[in-house]
Amino acid sequence: MAENTLLDGKRVLAVDDEQDVLDTLVDLLPMCELVTAPSFEKAKELLESQPFDLVILDIMGVDGYGLLEIATRKNIPAVMLTAHAWSPDNLVRSIKEGAVSYLPKEELTNIIDYLTDVLIAKKEGRDPWKSWHDRLPVSYFEKRWGAAWKDTDKQFWETFKAGLKAKRAASKKEE
């Protein structure tokens, strides 16, 4: 089974106040039933009235964290996609508030890989952050945020890393 087929027919809500980003997602995800929303209000209305398999949320301009709260409450996996809110603080907040991935818009062309990783992890009962961590290694963040980027929230990152290791060990036992 080609990994792409996991996305076939999935209902995905993409929310961004930049129309060119929404247009790019439409072009990149033709296998999905992609619904787009340019505002918090429109996205909130859609989230509360329609079923979705995944959501892709910008942070700035559309109150992405408000939408993340709704998606999390409805058990819809949420991928945060951002340019202006690309920071260690927003990464930590996204994880803590229930997002399953956090991507810089420069990774938009690889969105199929990230969404597929999320669906595979969900299907296998694994933590989607493990695949994310593999695709965007620490060196990626060090180049953008400096070598000490984890220092301000050291306890969080130690707990996060330990959680990934524990989940990995548990999934290996099941195999």
Stretches with model-predicted labels:
Residues 5, 19-36:
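Two-component/phosphorelay signaling modules centered on CheY-like receiver
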Residues 9:
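Phosphate-coordination loops involved in phosphoryl transfer and adenosine-cofactor binding
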Residues 14-17:
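Acidic di-acidic motifs
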Residues 19, 36-54, 62:
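Acidic, metal-coordinating helix/loop segments flanking the phosphotransfer/catalytic sites
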Residues 24-29, 46, 70, 93:
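Alpha-helical interaction/dimerization surfaces of two-component signaling modules
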Residues 56, 60, 68-71, 75-89:
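A short, hydrophobic beta-strand element within the central beta-sheet of small alpha/beta folds
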Residues 66, 85-104, 109-113, 117:
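Alpha4 helix (beta4-alpha4-beta5 surface) of REC/receiver domains from two-component response regulators
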Residues 120-175:
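C-terminal output/effector regions of signal-responsive regulators
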